[in-house]
Amino acid sequence: MIILAIESSCDETGVGIAELSEDGTVTLLADEVASSVDEHARFGGVVPEIASRAHLEALGPTMRRALDTAGVGRPDVVAATIGPGLAGALLVGVAAAKAYSAAWQVPFYGVNHLGGHLAADVYDHGPLPESVGLLVSGGHTHLLHVRSLGEPIIELGSTVDDAAGEAYDKVARLLGLGYPGGKVLDDLARQGDREAIVFPRGMTGPRDDPFAFSFSGLKTAVARYVESHPEASQADVAAGFQEAVADVLTRKAVRAAETLGVSTLLIAGGVAANSRLRELAEQRCAESGLTLRIPRPRLCTDNGAMIASFAAHLIAAGAPPSPLEAASDPGLPVVRSQVA
């Protein structure tokens, strides 16, 4: 079965094509992405209207490249991110997917963007066993219990304020590093001393929810430090901030796996591309006897391949198609795998 999937939840226009075999194996055939990030950079963040217009302009050419790369003329299924995300951006991808579904007379699946991030790892490491999932991106930070990708995902905890990726962008802006902040702040942090400045670790007290996160206080602490120490090394500030984020994320994720008695930790989402998060997660999983799974950096960021993978797993589990009347949902919760 050939599955074509469209991703348009934010500022990347992605088209992925995957093949679902009879034994449940999912093979990636094409992964084409067009980004409008440069158009948003001068505004210091994603502008929804610009993102929607960019999707309209990029979707056709991106679709053509994906079909050519895969050598596919007509897929058996069309899927799309139906939420969560920017309302206008979602509408572009969902409307296009429905149109292709109707034209090709094939089923349509509207699936969850967040589940897609988890499913991306299958391309690199094969079938996913029962896992604790740490999903970290620009707009989301969740700890999840993933029994299988075809079953409902269970949320263990999430951020009570800023997402980890959002904190990265805000601190990068504070340091004058521009947008998007994740990659440039990571690069700067590698030049600094992560022990030179110790920033607070939110929600790590004995009375705090062990599976909840908070990064607002950390962001404020960095701002106050920079204001009171104008001579401080930006690299040290970046390294101290990054260490605080990676420490909390990995500490809570490992604890969740140990609490549930699950032997695999999956880290996914855009922030999973961060070098220190990957390094510290590997170290702590080795110490705890856990198997760590993280997709290659390209599959951590938004793409259509991850949506194709998630749709494939839902189909393999017997999920019904979504009606063409299904509406996109900008606030779709992680526990809803699809809109059916």
Curated annotation (Swiss-Prot):
Essential cofactor(s): Fe(2+)
Cellular compartment(s): Cytoplasm
GO biological process, one term: tRNA threonylcarbamoyladenosine modification
Entries under InterPro entries matching the protein: ATPase_NBD (IPR043129), Gcp-like_dom (IPR000905), KAE1/TsaD (IPR017861), Peptidase_M22_CS (IPR017860), TsaD (IPR022450)
Gene3D superfamilies from the UniProt entry: 3.30.420.40
Source species, domain of life: Bacteria
GO CC terms: cytoplasm
Reactions listed under catalytic activity: L-threonylcarbamoyladenylate + adenosine(37) in tRNA = N(6)-L-threonylcarbamoyladenosine(37) in tRNA + AMP + H(+)
UniProt keyword tRNA processing, yes or no: yes
Binding site for substrate: 135-139, 169, 182, 186, 274
Location, primary (coarse class): cytoplasm
Keywords: Acyltransferase, Cytoplasm, Iron, Metal-binding, Transferase, tRNA processing
EC class of the enzyme, as a word: transferase
Annotated EC: 2.3.1.234
Role according to the record: Required for the formation of a threonylcarbamoyl group on adenosine at position 37 (t(6)A37) in tRNAs that read codons beginning with adenine. Is involved in the transfer of the threonylcarbamoyl moiety of threonylcarbamoyl-AMP (TC-AMP) to the N6 group of A37, together with TsaE and TsaB. TsaD likely plays a direct catalytic role in this reaction.
NCBIfam families assigned: gcp_kae1 (TIGR00329), T6A_TsaD_YgjD (TIGR03723)
Entry protein name: tRNA N6-adenosine threonylcarbamoyltransferase
